[in-house]
């Protein structure tokens, strides 16, 4: 077994240094800059993304139907009570998702890259499918904290461990600007797996999304900061507990993330917020 796979299975995450070079990173920054520049604010509701307030979790059709689209989600501190931006739009965004890997050629190139393919071959994935992609801004001064969580709360598969995230640092991620923190080995505990973010399947005008089960609490002293350099990435097991603090620095902490499931002998939950459509099926990482 390779060191990469051994460390990943031991800790639930692994850092892989210098996967993408400066040119590849600058191409991504250029692509996201153009996407933001071309965004017409009038065409997009100012959905605020927060993982702290369960009832504010962008529980609307804009979020629900974003699996094969490029959609925009704003920082809490960037939208006032009247729904107006308090900062320029390029500094107001929390994230863009969830179909960058489908619709933008630069993001598609980074996603279906031979280097990413080799990583998933290295951890034994036979039929990896890319289920979502996000560009996370973590803006200077207002970049919100992401509370402790496991990715399988939001994207549930059976078997539950057939989900892996890839977190690519587009900027250097340091303690000061809100790098990720992990509880090493926490992916081995499935006792809190009843907590989920699901579709309600409501047709009466009620909430479209909700959290079910008991929200787990974690020993904060067990978290370890994992700073990484620009162009490096973190491979993240779907059950490992992680979080990030608010960005109180004057430096951005951009990241591009994808989530990949092992399709072989795996069931994608029909209650997941994110679903395939008649037009869109999750693409195979190895066949693009």
From Swiss-Prot:
E.C. number(s) listed in UniProt: 1.-.-.-
InterPro entries (UniProt xref): Phytyl_CoA_dOase-like (IPR008775)
Sites where the protein binds 2-oxoglutarate: 95, 134, 149-151, 167, 244, 253
The UniProt record lists the keyword Oxidoreductase: yes
Keywords of the record: Dioxygenase, Iron, Metal-binding, Oxidoreductase
UniProt enzyme class: oxidoreductase
Pfam assignment, any one: PhyH
Names of the cofactor(s): Fe cation
Molecular function in Gene Ontology: dioxygenase activity; metal ion binding
Family according to the record: Belongs to the PhyH family. PHYHD1 subfamily.
Protein name: Phytanoyl-CoA dioxygenase domain-containing protein 1 homolog
Native source organism of the sequence: Caenorhabditis briggsae
